């Protein structure tokens, strides 16, 4: 009898690991696959006002320009959830962890950059997507910062990052068929000047640190070959040569 009674009160839990660099849609898919909550519920919750008590989310002041308000703040880590958990509770665990990771020391460093937390998280998310490894993160960061600072003068005001082109999707093939041919992302850094409206994924602590403390370089261009080797350039002409070396241009 005791055994039967103990089962009445047992609630099934599940551990889920979210790798670095997932976007909100991928977080939602993982939650559904693990029986935490449905993908649809998570995506609906991601744009609700339920997270406005978090300072990080409160600071987002352009939510109408974003696809998902919580993008960038769902910290990659391993979490324990209840099966069929409320989606707001589930997402809150990830946001709360992000809040903890962005401690006073890190927030003070961000303040010293003269940028907002959200701008740094946006840069970090692009670094996460565009970099081959940790060392590369700091150089990619320097290139993004150099373009943001000098772009108007030297014609590099557009960040021109492939990872932003189809956001909130990864690739054109992920865009729903009905809008695939005409889809234009508001985050496409080939089209817009400066930073996109917000983060494009949920970056790691390393990417955030790289966004805060870029290497000191005078590069404005980068590319990678299929093996992840990085090529950096100061001028458009050098970049064209690098694209050929990397097998990305004729």
Segments (PLM) and residue ranges:
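Glycine-rich loop/hinge motif
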Residues: 3, 8-36, 109-117
């Amino acid at each position: 009898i005791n055994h039967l009674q103990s089962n009445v009160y047992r609630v099934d839990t599940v551990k889920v690991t979210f790798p670095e660099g997932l976007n909100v849609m991928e977080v939602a898919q993982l939650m559904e696959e693990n029986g935490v909550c449905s993908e649809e519920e998570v995506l609906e919750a991601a744009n609700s006002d339920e997270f406005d008590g978090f300072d990080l989310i409160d600071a987002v002041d352009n939510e109408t320009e974003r696809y998902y308000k919580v993008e960038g703040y769902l910290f990659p880590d391993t979490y324990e959830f209840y099966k069929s958990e409320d989606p707001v509770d589930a997402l809150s665990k990830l946001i709360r962890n992000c809040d903890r990771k962005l401690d006073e020391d890190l927030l003070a460093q961000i303040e010293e950059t003269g940028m907002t937390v959200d701008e740094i998280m946006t840069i970090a998310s692009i670094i996460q997507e565009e970099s081959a490894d940790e060392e590369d993160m700091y150089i990619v960061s320097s290139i993004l910062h150099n373009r943001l600072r000098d772009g108007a003068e030297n014609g590099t005001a557009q960040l021109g990052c492939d990872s932003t082109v189809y956001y909130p999707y990864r690739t054109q093939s992920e865009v729903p068929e009905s809008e695939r041919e005409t889809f234009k992302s508001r985050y496409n850094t080939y089209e817009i000047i400066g930073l996109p409206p917000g983060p494009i994924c949920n970056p790691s602590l390393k990417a955030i640190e790289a966004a805060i403390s870029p290497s000191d370089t005078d590069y404005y261009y980068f590319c990678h070959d299929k093996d992840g080797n990085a090529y950096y350039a100061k001028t458009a002409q050098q970049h064209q040569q690098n694209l050929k070396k990397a097998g990305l241009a004729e």
